[in-house]
Curated annotation (Swiss-Prot):
Tissue: Expressed by the venom duct.
Chief place where the protein resides: secreted
Residues annotated as glycosylated: 84, 104, 155, 158, 218, 266
Top class in the EC scheme: hydrolase
Cellular component per GO, a single term: extracellular region
Protein name: Venom serine protease
Active-site residues, as the UniProt record annotates them: 75 (charge relay system), 126 (charge relay system), 220 (charge relay system)
Domain Peptidase S1: 34-269
Database matches in CDD domains: Tryp_SPc
Keywords: Allergen, Disulfide bond, Glycoprotein, Hydrolase, Protease, Secreted, Serine protease, Signal
Localization terms from the record: Secreted
Xref: Gene3D superfamilies: Trypsin-like serine proteases
Length: 277
């Protein structure tokens, strides 16, 4: 292994990312008034997006990373390649998808382009970038997450992270009508391997677990957020990929965002990211 080349590549990626940062905000949340609840406040998490499909009852989550891109799971889009993603829309600023009365920032966007990771398969490299035809209208209620430029080597084991989505409230149950949140803990790769094996639980997977808590069906593609202890910004560290069933004794598997920063950069060339203060 040529360590020199690996170090040079890492420095190059970080250098490119920093050269494209701007002094604009990212990764903020709006204070919640809900105590010990799992429903979020309206527009509490401005970076959350949702993919909606022609088929009723199917949803995926996503996260705003630039004014025209979201990141999601590849399996949310792979089977729609043959139809050029016709009928799929990106929705931002949403809380309760059955009504538009609780917030004035909900907007639907058509898709211009989808970039699926070239090495995606059913359990590896499950990440994709969606570009919309129009740019998002940023406000305090709609805006980007922070990407982990400053945390490429940070060990998140035992750290608390937050999963967000409109997914099912229990396995094979009904979808939540409102955006919900759940706090989980990051576990070690070795712990994850005992459930899924080394081929799946590789270095590109971020595994999360808490007894009785989990992301669930239709939460796929949604964010796993970690709050920076130094800046208080919300950092995108994972993209929801899979679980055995919802909230059983097996961890959830999420694409580890730090492993895919070069892919994200290459899929968003020409865009600028906001940096954490």
């Amino acid at each position: 292994m040529n360590c020199g080349k690996i170090i040079l590549l890492f420095i190059t990626i970080i250098g490119v990312a920093k050269s494209r940062e701007e002094n604009c905000k990212c990764g903020w949340d709006n204070p919640s008034r809900i105590v010990n609840g799992v429903e979020t406040e309206i527009n509490e998490f401005p970076m959350v997006a949702r993919l909606i499909y022609p088929s009723p009852g199917m949803y995926c989550g996503g996260t705003i990373i630039t004014p025209q891109h979201i990141v999601t799971a590849a399996h949310c889009l792979q089977k729609y390649k043959r139809t050029n993603y016709t009928g799929i829309h990106v929705v931002v600023g949403e809380h309760d998808y059955t009504t538009d009365t609780e917030t004035n920032v909900t907007k639907r966007y058509t898709i211009a382009e989808v970039t699926i990771h070239p090495n995606y398969n059913s359990h590896n490299n499950d990440i994709a970038i969606v570009k919309t035809n129009e740019r998002f209208e940023y406000s305090m209620k709609v805006g980007p997450v922070c990407l982990p430029f400053n945390y490429m080597t940070r060990n998140l084991t035992n750290e608390t992270v937050t999963a967000l989505g409109w997914g099912k409230l229990r396995y094979n149950g009904q979808n939540s009508k409102v955006l919900r949140k759940v706090d989980l803990h990051v576990i070690t790769r070795e712990q994850c391997e005992t459930h899924y094996g080394a081929a799946i639980a590789n270095a590109n997977l971020l595994c999360t677990f808490d007894v009785g808590r989990d992301a669930c069906q239709n939460d796929s593609g949604g964010p796993i957020l970690w709050r920076s202890p130094t800046t208080d910004n919300l950092i995108l560290v994972g993209v929801v990929n899979f679980g055995r069933t919802c909230a059983d004794d097996a961890p959830g598997g999420n694409a580890r965002v730090t492993s895919f920063m070069e892919f994200i950069h290459n899929a968003t060339i020409g865009e600028t990211y906001c940096k954490a203060d």
